């Protein structure tokens, strides 16, 4: 498996056993497949080793998928694996969310944004909301919904409201997951996202 080979050199993921990779990475990612319209454009923010973006593409996601990853080694892995697998309509952007979210080619251009093991929810909201269009969806992949309370102000500032919450168990495991879907009710203010590093240092 490419992920295991590259992980030995570049530490792409802390999950190293092949069964755990299939369950905790692929199984977790694919639980989104039924919840997203595959004809919608998608950006996977802080994708790391390509989760959930690459499994969604392998499963047949039809529209454009952009994998956003700031780490150069991880971005190189993503280029290699997408080329090796011959995946179409999938693109790699090596950049910080706070920077890419201000670029015209990415800002409010997507129907869906996803984020997995990236940051606390009140930070993720500022990372991900700038990429989605009005009426678009941001999906936060979490273990539970306890972070919603601390994210209320960020949601208000970025014009997001909870659309639905899906609590599931990853197949072939007892691992609980909670996918929180947010809908963007209007376009965000020009001041968001704030400068590189600020959302993490001073969450809304």
Question: What are the functions of these language-model segments?
Answer:
Residues 135-145:
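Conserved beta-strand signature within the Rossmann-like core of class I S-adenosyl-L-methionine
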């Amino acid at each position: 498996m490419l992920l295991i080979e590259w992980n030995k050199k570049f530490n792409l993921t802390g999950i190293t056993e092949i069964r755990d990779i299939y369950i905790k990475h692929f199984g977790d990612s694919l639980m989104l497949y039924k919840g997203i319209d595959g004809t919608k454009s998608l950006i996977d923010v802080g994708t790391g080793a390509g989760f959930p973006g690459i499994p969604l593409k392998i499963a047949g996601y039809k529209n454009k998928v952009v994998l956003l990853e700031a780490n150069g080694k991880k971005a190189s892995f993503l280029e290699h694996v997408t080329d090796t697998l011959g995946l179409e309509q999938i693109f790699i952007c090596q950049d910080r969310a706070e920077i890419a979210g201000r670029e015209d080619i990415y800002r409010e251009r997507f129907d869906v944004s996803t984020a997995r093991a990236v940051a606390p929810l009140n930070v993720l909201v500022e990372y991900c909301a700038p990429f989605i269009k009005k009426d678009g969806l941001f999906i936060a992949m979490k273990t539970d919904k306890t972070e919603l309370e601390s994210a209320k102000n960020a949601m208000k500032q970025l014009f997001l409201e909870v659309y639905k919450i899906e609590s599931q168990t990853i197949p072939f495991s007892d691992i609980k997951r909670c996918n929180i879907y947010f809908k963007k009710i209007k376009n965000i203010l020009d001041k968001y996202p704030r400068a590189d590093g600020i959302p993490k240092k001073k969450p809304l």
